[in-house]
Structures are given as structure tokens and as C-alpha cells.
Amino acid sequence: MADKVCCPGPICGSNNNAAGGGFREAVCVHTKKVYDSCRSKECLRDIRVFLCRDAQELLNAGGIASVKPRSAELLCVKIDVERVQFNRGFYTVDIRFFYRIECEVSCVIGRPRIIDGLAVFDKRVILFGGEGGARIFSSRFIEDDTDIQLCPDSNKPTAVVEVVDPILLDARIVSPDTSCNCCCCALHEVPRSICSCFGGGHLVVSGDESQVFV
């Protein structure tokens, strides 16, 4: 008599009938659970573009007739999850988006030039992440030897961000005396991996020079 075969699929059938495509008994699966989510469309404006030194010197030299937007590319997303005090189970998710902005600068004399720089946008949301506080221990099987003990883990929430590249609609040059120069336009630290996307060059973050906003 041929052996009965259990095919992967939902639990179904009766009288322990596995030929119907189901399991004879439930199977436990260790997986992640989605506790909460949100979705939004953002229309960003007045975002400063931090230029490389050579592009900044071109703006400071003057003689710029116009600046046109070309493209925007998402380079990286930095996520920080922290527990909300006095609100059990809820967490703040701070998200920082790093964009490469490319613009075309037309000079009064000479041909147009392409410049690029870094734009940063911050967003914060509050989501439910579960109330569990379990610690998880696991091991890796080794035959005829002591199993490897893996690093302990926990069921703390993990944030996942899905985003598409933006569409650049406008760009303009702002003189330092008319820009706000407030904390909303400040950039105090740029990760090394982001700097490498601009050839490892120094990004100008001071507010006393001509600036590009998108």
C-alpha cells in the first residue's frame, strides 16, 4: 500500500484525510505580526538642498539666470523606534528621508551646468506595537555536538517603511538674508554612507551663503 502524502495547504478534510490536500494536525509557525500601519501622501515644499563645495561656489559667484529641477532620488531612510511613555503598547517612529536632488543651473554667460545636493525630510508617526515583553532564545542545530546558542531576541516592534521616489516640481535660489536659517532647515550631521553618494565631498551646511530650495 502506498504511503499517505500530506501536501502543504490549509487544514481541511475529515477523518484525518490527508489526501484532500490538508494537514492531519495543525503546524506552529514562528512569524512576525503586523500590529499597526499608516499611509500618507506628502507634498513637500521649502526643503533646502545642501550642495557640494564646487556647486556652492558656483552659486556664490553670482550670474545665475535660473535654476530648473531635474530629478529626485531617495538614497536612504533612517528609522528610530521609541516607546511612548504612559501609553502602553504605543511607539513613536521617527523617519528621516535622505534625497539626492539634481538641478540645472543656467548662467548668464556660458552653458548650463548640472548640480546636485542632499535634501532631508523628517516625519514622525505613533503606532501600536503590542504589549508583549517576551524574550526569545534559539539555537542552531549541530549534529553530534553542542548546538550553537544564538543571541537572545525579544518581541519588540520592528518598523518597516515603504516609499517611492518623489517627483520634483520646482526649484529656486534663495539669498542668505531672505532664508529663515531656523532649525527646520538645519542639518547637523550627515552619515558617512550618504556623503559617499556625493563622491565623499564636503556638503555645505552653513546658512550664510546662497541656498537652493525645492
Language-model features: where?
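Viral structural modules
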Residues: 1-214
